[in-house]
Amino acid sequence: MLFRSWTFYRFKNFDTYYYLGGQELAQYTGRVAENEIADIEQLFDYKINGRFQFIIYNKLTDFEQSNIGLGTDELNTNTGGLTKLVGNKVLVYFDGDFRHFKEQLRAGIAQVLINQLLYGGSVKERVQSAALINFPDWYIKGLITFVAKGWPLEDDNQLRILLHEKGPKHFNALCEINSTLAGQSLWNFVVNRYGPSTISNLIYMSRVNKNIEGGFVYVIGSSLKELNKNWKEYYTPIYQNDDTLFTNTNEKPALKFKKKTQNITQLKLSPDGNSIAFIENNSGKYKCFIYDFSKNKKRKMFKGGYKHEASYLDEANPLIAWHPSGKYLTSIYEKKGHYKMDYFELGKNIKRTSSKFYYFDKVLDFSYSSNGNDIVLSGVQKGQSDLFIFNPRTKFTRQLTNDRWDDNHPKFVMNDQYILFQSTRFTDSLKTTSFKQKEDLFTSNTTDLFLYDCLNFSPKLIQLTNTPLVNETNPLMIDNAHFLYLSDVSGIKNRQLATLDSTIAFIDTSIHYKYIFSSESVSNYSSDIQLQDVNFNKTKTAFINFYNRRFNLFTITPQAILSSRISQLNKTTRRKSIDRDAIPKERQNDVNTILDVTNQDNPVKLADTIKHASNSFITDFPKSNNSEKGNTSISIPTPKDSIISVVSDSTFYQMPKQRNYDVTFA
């Protein structure tokens, strides 16, 4: 395999190991890891012993094949589970989303630090300490997750759904359902109630007392029983108030999924809207079905994968899309480390044609042009996700974007002249970027919508949304003037309807148009819309929503959407908190504005930080370099809630010398 030949960069406090195709990811890790290590050390008031070794995989399937740590006792004492970890080796992979990649880095750093704090630095110390101290999963995994990504909206909504109506009545019951989310929510409660410095104090006193009960009693004066009660009293009124602001789905479900925890990762309406294809993914083992609305029957098309208990799920494998003719369904999937493209010709007997698809490390999404001759896709090459046009007949691929911003969910629109897509970019100019320039590391932590003129291959994009705190995802076009997309502007992922209009800006040798984009809410559901799609004929849309304690499939016509505008936009408590605290007062009106896309302001730079005082306990842990400065700034990240990630103060960054690593990790 390609990843047997390793190369690495040696930085001051860590090394980044990579193989063919992963150099750019190693450079990115080198730019951001130093700040993340210092930030997490400051949070825990502890200096990590030893050097980090970040082992970087280009994709999830390579990551799953790793044999690092096999045959040692270290995996048996790995108290985490969110990131593969052996000693100070942190294993991460790239799935096309730099936000998730950075979360993995933070989770791995936090995991190493927590292991050292609780169990000591060496394997011998960990084994001895593990026999004396038993920390539950919610404590360790919840803390690692909270340090990695804070308390984002999707986790807040997941907890609200679990606690809704007939959900778990107490904290321990929630732990049986989802111990990581339970612990993450408890640490969020502790930080909000007692401050971020409480984290390091609790860990230290838990280690001293050899149990977590003693730590909580000594630091916050509450037993675990009292703490769990306070946790419930903290979240219950918040979610009860939120529930009064939103409504359940009133439509009758077109299809009810049998399993309450069913993961539907793909949803594609047939061109005529009479049937729908979807992927059921059960912990890595997937099945593709086509459901006929009129016959109320579903037909299995194919299956694959294998079931595993890992915490990661590849939602982009497999991918499916209908050919505009409706005669066959196309699937792009990964098997044994290689991509394939299969065509399923529909009829009484399904005819399957398979071809190899060599071009990408990973494919994130794809869709057909209206004539079926071309495919637009989001593909990963050399550690970045870009847009490409692929011709299935000639096998010719043309790259449209080539930069460090994450581009996904592309669709041909407006008679195939434009491509509608979502991206983390904050500029409307296309250019080639690298991680050596400081400006190329500015990345929006939320996604906006863009239009690309693929007829003229314009270097200038049309930016449709500019919402620094809001994620716009899954864009669709339901007629010539209206877009439909999902937005968490209310704190819950609901439908937004957007209208694109144009006026003449000026005339010289040709007419130049100025585009105006406005949006409004057209759904007010109390739970996230997971996926949505519209058929080629624009007669039906479909979406998946949580209803009656399970996920269900609903359909609605575009005409009904156009007439279902919401007069007042309600927001969850968590969304209000983000809007209030995360941006300067002078920019608070930017959260949901009508955007003139020809005259945009650049997003402001913002660090999502929490101020706190020095720890009140004197510990025997080594102090971090910044711990003697009195009042300091600690970052409890909510990556998708902050505006811009900035990782370096230098304009140009000189990478260290590349070194070959000849001995395979084992």
Task: Walk through the language-model features, giving the residues of each.
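A flexible loop/linker signature enriched in serine peptidases of the S9 family
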Residues: N157, K260-T261, I279-F289, Y306-D314, ...
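A short beta-strand motif characteristic of beta-propeller blades
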Residues: K252-K258, K297-S311, I350-F357, F396-T401, ...
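Juxtacatalytic substrate-recognition/specificity segment
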Residues: M1-S129, P136, L153-E154, G215
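Active-site-proximal alpha-helical
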Residues: T16, I40, F135-D155, R160-G221
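Outer-membrane beta-barrel initiation region
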Residues: L606-A666
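Beta/coil-rich, acidic/histidine-enriched accessory regions frequently appended to metallopeptidases
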Residues: W6-R10, Y204, V208-S311, E315-I320, ...
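Short coil turn/linker residues within repeat-based beta-strand modules
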Residues: K295-K297, K336, G347-I350, R393-F396, ...
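Blade-terminus and WD-like Trp-Asp/Gly-His loop motifs, strongest in beta-propeller folds
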Residues: L267-S275, L319-Y328, F366-D374, P410-Y418, ...
